């Protein structure tokens, strides 16, 4: 069992009403937990990951260009190493995300091959069903969800999700912790909840950390479990009852560079783009909404972030 203070829950047990008080305290206090028994197994994760990794390693430049979107407000298809910068969005720097990725959603997808599409669509559907059920449990447990204010849960969870597979290669010397402490800047997700399935670094280094109770807590790989993180839409949907924990991906030190590569399969359960919220309330919940309007939509917010995220600087040589 991994050494972590973050609780582990089982979806079937939660469905049957077990651990309700512990679950409520966890989601309203931490906003992050591990989940087992959610319907996707190791075989599912491995097949989807291997399919993307084969494309990352063997796809030609022309093949990658064919599935790279030129629409900056969309997360679809291939995104090259260091093509994005979470730090630019969060205004914490200009360094790039040291990762490459492939993304898909409900529609507007681009795939390298029919087989890639088949594998990923089956994987997407399993994670979508699990995320919807989990989000329903999380929002209900919070005690802050009010259908008269937000609308029905069914409508909220009939969502606009995104699946993104990130590959974090071994870092070059100029991206080791001594030079740049993070592979990916601190941020909270623009989602209701997020599923994160990780593969461990071969050398044992733990990259993913979340801020819990004012301290950074490592989130190691737990066998047969995903990390579930409340995103920024969670406090907006529960009148602030749920937090949206900031998290980041650490860089290894120079002595831990070898064997530090890892993958992260991330499923963002996002509301539809017309989900509206009060900008003032969002700011009162600690969310950095940089929009000059009283009422904004999810589409307004995420569109601005995606444009800002695309790295303006050329990747550093190293």
From Swiss-Prot:
One of its GO terms (molecular function) is L-ascorbic acid binding. Residues 158-271 form the Fe2OG dioxygenase domain. Keywords: Antibiotic biosynthesis, Iron, Oxidoreductase, Vitamin C. It comes from the Bacteria. InterPro entries: IPNS-like_FE2OG_OXY, IPNS-like_sf, Iron_ascorbate_oxido_reductase, Oxoglu/Fe-dep_dioxygenase_dom. Its cofactor is Fe cation. Disulfide bonds: none annotated. Pfam families: 2OG-FeII_Oxy (PF03171). Its EC number is 1.14.11.26. It catalyses: deacetoxycephalosporin C + 2-oxoglutarate + O2 = deacetylcephalosporin C + succinate + CO2. Pathway: Antibiotic biosynthesis; cephalosporin C biosynthesis. One of its GO terms (biological process) is antibiotic biosynthetic process. Belongs to the iron/ascorbate-dependent oxidoreductase family. Monomer. Hydroxylation of desacetoxicephalosporin C in 3'position to form deacetylcephalosporin C. This is Deacetoxycephalosporin C hydroxylase. It comes from Streptomyces clavuligerus. The gene is cefF.
């Amino acid at each position: 069992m991994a050494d972590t203070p973050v609780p582990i829950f089982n979806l079937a047990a939660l469905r049957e009403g077990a651990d309700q008080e512990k679950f409520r305290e966890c989601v309203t206090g931490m906003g992050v937990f591990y989940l087992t028994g959610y319907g996707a197994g190791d075989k599912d994760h491995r097949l989807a990951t291997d399919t993307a990794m084969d494309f990352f390693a063997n796809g030609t430049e022309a093949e990658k260009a064919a599935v790279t979107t030129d629409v900056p407000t969309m997360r679809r298809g291939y995104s090259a190493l260091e093509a994005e910068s979470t730090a630019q969005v969060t205004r914490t720097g200009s360094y790039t995300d040291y990762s490459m990725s492939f993304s898909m959603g409900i529609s507007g997808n681009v795939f390298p091959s029919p087989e890639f599409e088949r594998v990923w669509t089956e994987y997407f559907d399993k994670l979508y069903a699990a995320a919807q059920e989990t989000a329903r449990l999380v929002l209900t447990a919070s005690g802050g969800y009010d259908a008269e204010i937000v609308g029905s849960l069914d409508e909220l969870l009939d969502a606009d999700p995104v699946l993104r597979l990130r590959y974090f290669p071994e870092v070059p010397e100029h991206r080791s912790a001594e030079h740049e402490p993070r592979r990916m800047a601190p941020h909270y997700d623009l989602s209701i909840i997020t599923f994160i399935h990780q593969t461990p670094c071969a050398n044992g280094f733990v990259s993913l950390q979340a801020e819990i109770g004012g301290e950074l807590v490592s989130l190691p790989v737990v066998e047969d479990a995903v990390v579930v993180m409340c995103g920024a839409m969670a406090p907006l949907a529960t009148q602030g009852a749920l937090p949206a924990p900031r998290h980041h991906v650490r860089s290894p030190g120079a002595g831990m560079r070898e064997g530090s590569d890892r993958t992260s399969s991330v499923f963002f359960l996002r509301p539809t783009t017309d989900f509206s919220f009060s900008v003032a309330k969002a700011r009162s919940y600690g969310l950095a909404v940089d929009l000059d309007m009283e009422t904004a939509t999810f589409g307004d917010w995420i569109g601005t972030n995606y444009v800002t995220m695309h790295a303006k600087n050329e990747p550093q040589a190293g």
